From Swiss-Prot:
It comes from Macaca fascicularis. GO terms for molecular function: aspartic-type endopeptidase activity. Belongs to the DDI1 family. This is Protein DDI1 homolog 1. Residues 103-122 have a biased composition (Polar residues). It comes from the Eukaryota. The lineage of its organism: Eukaryota, Metazoa, Chordata, Craniata, Vertebrata. InterPro entries: DDI1_N, Peptidase_aspartic_DDI1-type, Peptidase_aspartic_dom_sf, Ubiquitin-like_dom, Ubiquitin-like_domsf. Residues 1-81 form the Ubiquitin-like domain. Transmembrane segments: none annotated.
Length: 396
């Protein structure tokens, strides 16, 4: 019969393999086969079937009710003595989505000199190319050591800031106590998720609720994998683009107008209309409600005004909105009227009726309400730089 084994090691790494055995195969011999596949010593193996721990090593698999196609869970025991040199497990890893850190060094003793020698090697051999894991020396369970390692590696620090903002914020706060609290909380949360997942794998395969949870977990894993592939292959898709603004003038007052071909009409804020001295021309019979992502009240409409773009004076009408963060938005009515085209290759707006071109504004010249990098992001980048520099000075 074919038995599928789902293995979970002490460091939370996982493996799945299948074994072809007979029903009268003893449990102790089955553990020996599992040791060869999982690299977990037979004396540390626990086999679970249908939420029941198989204890008697001399009993056959058939006596426990195992049959062809069944799935069992292999768990590695905790709190065991030192291992033989030839049975050292794989190096544990830190998952930056959950920061799962292996157990303390009490279960696997290691000399300080060995730890110092292995730390740089582990960091060099296990990069964060995928943004998921990084190699950590055996027994690295101290929040202080983890904090020092992250602060000394700018690449890992930037990935941590992107993948795990709460832990990155605690790291950059400069408080070891805060970092330890956040780290331990995420460890506990990750352990609870692992326990729930093990419970699902050992549940009744005919249970609809368990199958629905397994389906949801597989879906989340596919989403994470899709995101990681996108980060590797198309990182530009995670960036933000600057909005299209141009310089113009209305009634002699300089403005920055947002070019939006998806907007039906050209609009202006009430505050901007007051600065341009055109509120006296507002026809309040055209009052209403503008609906889009949200809703805003339309005070009225200015039927005819002049807008200056470069050297051209163009006729335009405005709908005046009561509470609008941007001064003016050039909608499709104005763009079609003057046969405007958006040339993204040249980064210009072309006025079709006159042939005039005006460049779109760079991010530094955009209004504050439309800049994609705010002060908080800039300060976070500065904090990372200062933390890395401080860490380097302390080491020297």
């Amino acid at each position: 019969m074919l038995i599928t084994v789902y293995c979970v090691r002490r460091d939370l790494s996982e493996a799945t393999f299948s074994l072809q055995v007979s029903p009268d195969f003893e449990l102790r011999n089955f553990k020996v086969l599992c040791e060869a596949e999982s690299r977990v010593p037979a004396e540390e193996i626990q086999i679970i079937h249908m939420e029941r721990l198989l204890i008697e090593d001399h009993c056959s698999l058939g006596s426990y009710g195992l049959k062809d196609g069944d799935v069992v869970v292999l768990l590695q025991k905790d709190n065991v003595g030192p291992r033989a040199p030839g049975r050292a497990p794989n190096q544990p890893r830190i998952d930056f989505s959950g920061i799962a850190v292996p157990g303390t060094s009490s279960s696997r003793p290691q000399h300080p000199g060995q730890q110092q020698q292995r730390t740089p090697a582990a960091q060099r051999s296990h990069g964060l190319a995928s943004g998921e894991t990084v190699g950590v020396p055996q027994g690295l369970g101290s929040p202080g050591l983890i904090r020092s390692m992250l602060l000394s590696n700018p690449h890992d620090l930037s990935l941590l800031k992107e993948r795990n903002p709460p832990l990155a914020e605690a790291l950059l706060s400069g408080s070891l106590e805060t970092f330890s609290q956040v780290l331990m909380a995420q460890q506990r949360e990750k352990a609870l998720r692992e326990q729930e997942r093990l419970h699902l794998y050992t549940a009744d395969p005919l249970d609809r609720e368990a199958q629905a949870k397994i389906e949801e977990e597989i879906r989340q894993q596919n989403i994470e994998e899709n995101m990681n592939i996108a980060i590797e292959e198309a990182p530009e898709s995670f960036g933000q683009v600057t909005m299209l603004y141009i310089n113009c003038k209305v009634n002699g007052h300089p403005l920055k107008a947002f070019v939006d071909s998806g907007a039906q009409m050209t609009i202006m804020s009430q505050a901007c209309a007051e600065r341009c001295n055109i509120m006296r021309l507002v026809d309040r019979r055209w009052a209403g409600v503008a609906k889009g992502v949200g809703t805003q009240r339309i005070i009225g409409r200015v039927h005819l005004a002049q807008i200056q773009i470069e050297g051209d004076f163009l006729q335009c009408s405005f709908s005046i909105l009561e509470d609008q963060p941007m001064d003016m938005l050039l909608g499709l009515d104005m763009l079609r009227r003057h046969q405007c085209s958006i040339d993204l290759k040249k980064n210009v707006l072309v006025i079709g009726t006159t042939g005039t071109q005006t460049y779109f504004l760079p991010e530094g010249e955009l209004p504050l309400c439309s800049r994609m990098v705010n002060g908080k992001d800039e300060s976070s980048d500065k904090e990372i730089t200062h933390s890395v520099m401080d860490s380097g000075r302390k080491e020297h």
